[in-house]
Regions:
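Active-site nucleotide/adenylate-binding loops and adjacent lid/helix of ATP-dependent enzymes
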Residues: 1-14, 42, 56, 97-182
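Glycine-rich phosphate/pyrophosphate-binding beta-alpha loops
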Residues: 68, 147, 202-205
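ATP-binding N-terminal substructure of ATP-dependent carboxylate-amine bond-forming enzymes
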Residues: 1-93, 97-110, 122-129
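Phosphate-binding site of ATP-dependent enzymes
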Residues: 154-216
């Protein structure tokens, strides 16, 4: 893959201002290291700087390794499309939909795909009634990644506290029915689905700490 970049001017976009900035910085170190090992000297662009796009003059391809809002949600891709710079990853619409858990689940359900019961939390939501129906639930910011602002709740007081916490990441909050069972992740590279990997944690769920600061 790196050989296919021969003769191209490359930039790696990373950092940004989302809650996942530190994750992006770690990912960028890996990507930049691999490119350097392949004989390339990519332009390194931290998108936290103002008007970062002004640094991309002469760049042919951008590797977008940002995480979270502004980076994964189609915003960066829209800027690059406007500049005529090729970019790794999905297009604007695909990125925006994939970053929005509510819209993603609505699409899956519309396509007839099985997905856990869910609702968008509103001021009128009866937390106790939701838990009576589901038993327990996960509360998530609709447009955040890395499990930031996420909580597993089983009583109305915890539900209310989790909603307040999730809203610090954005107004839209998703409540999703808890399914007790093994968890798997599957990466998609182009049109190829890679082997499924089972996720196991010592306690709780696969939260930010487990993802980036433990042996899970």
């Amino acid at each position: 893959m790196i050989a296919a970049l021969q003769g191209k001017s490359l930039a790696v976009l990373f950092g940004g201002r989302s809650g996942e900035r530190e994750v992006s910085l770690a990912s960028a170190r890996t990507v930049i290291g691999a490119l350097r090992d392949g004989g390339y000297a990519p332009l390194e662009v931290d998108t936290a700087q103002s008007r970062w796009w002004d640094t991309l003059g002469g760049v042919d391809i951008a590797f977008n390794i940002q995480h979270g809002r502004g980076g994964e949600d189609g915003v960066t891709r829209a800027v690059l499309d406007e500049l005529g710079v090729l970019c790794s990853g999905s297009g604007v619409l695909g990125s925006a939909l994939a970053m929005d858990k509510l819209r993603s689940k609505q699409l899956w359900r519309g396509a007839g795909l099985p997905t856990a019961d869910f609702l968008e939390v509103a001021d009128s939501t009866d937390y106790r009634a939701v838990l009576d129906a589901w038993g327990s639930a996960f509360i998530k910011p609709a447009c955040e990644g890395s499990s930031l602002g996420m909580a597993h709740v089983s009583d109305a007081a915890a539900f209310a506290a989790a909603v307040l916490s999730a809203r610090q990441c954005g107004d839209a909050v998703l409540a999703e029915r808890f399914i007790d069972g093994p968890e798997y992740t599957v990466a998609i590279l182009g049109e190829q689905a890679l082997p499924a990997i089972r996720i196991a944690v010592e306690s709780g769920f696969y939260d930010y700490q487990a993802k980036y600061h433990s042996e899970a």
